[in-house]
């Protein structure tokens, strides 16, 4: 299958333009906010709808700043240190999920300190809605023909425009399905069938474990970033950065089981 060359810009009006990537962020945040408020209405945890509304600004800053700096520092530092002004061009792409995770964790911590609420209670809500953004973000990656997979002879192979014209795994769709749709369903099942919000840190632990496992496995099909390549012969940066998430998620679950 040959993927058509889709314009990454949906439309432009003068200097103003909307890209698929930016649209995925906006829609993801709005849907996440809507879903979080519905969960709060039903289960009435410590976190209120007002808290979520106030946290959105913190979340946006954490995602954008953390995601961009994470990409700059972890994936292409030499390029951006040579041309620092390029760091500000987020509209050209180049965001790190792991960097965004650190950014939103810091934002959540500062928010909880200001409003005197439990940190894990907030992250339990956040992690429940994150798969929505992950799904939309990976679909945008697919449309933009970026972050594609390794060369394959399987029937899943897709020829991406502006590439080497070899059939490759559509790893963006694998991630959208597992890290987005499947993880969303797992967390929704945990919340609505087992009321996991009653145990602070449980949802966060479930999310961290499943996301990191899915990411580590799918990285086996994803082409490593060209400027980094493989680390220690066979590992990718995504796998290495996901390992601490797996350990932290396991710790949160074990911590609850030991009580």
Swiss-Prot record:
GO molecular function, one term: phosphatidylglycerol-prolipoprotein diacylglyceryl transferase activity
Membrane topology note: Multi-pass membrane protein
Membrane spanning residue stretches: 9-29, 55-75, 92-112, 117-137, 172-192, 201-221, 228-248
Residues reported to bind a 1,2-diacyl-sn-glycero-3-phospho-(1'-sn-glycerol): 138
GO BP, sorted A to Z: lipoprotein biosynthetic process
Alphabetic keyword roster: Cell inner membrane, Cell membrane, Membrane, Transferase, Transmembrane, Transmembrane helix
Compartment(s) where it occurs, according to its Swiss-Prot or TrEMBL record: Cell inner membrane
GO cellular component: plasma membrane
Superkingdom of the organism of origin: Bacteria
Pathway per the UniProt entry: Protein modification; lipoprotein biosynthesis (diacylglyceryl transfer)
Protein role: Catalyzes the transfer of the diacylglyceryl group from phosphatidylglycerol to the sulfhydryl group of the N-terminal cysteine of a prolipoprotein, the first step in the formation of mature lipoproteins.
Similarity annotation: Belongs to the Lgt family.
Name of the protein described by the UniProt record: Phosphatidylglycerol--prolipoprotein diacylglyceryl transferase
Organism, scientific name: Rickettsia typhi (strain ATCC VR-144 / Wilmington)
Taxon lineage: Bacteria, Pseudomonadati, Pseudomonadota, Alphaproteobacteria, Rickettsiales
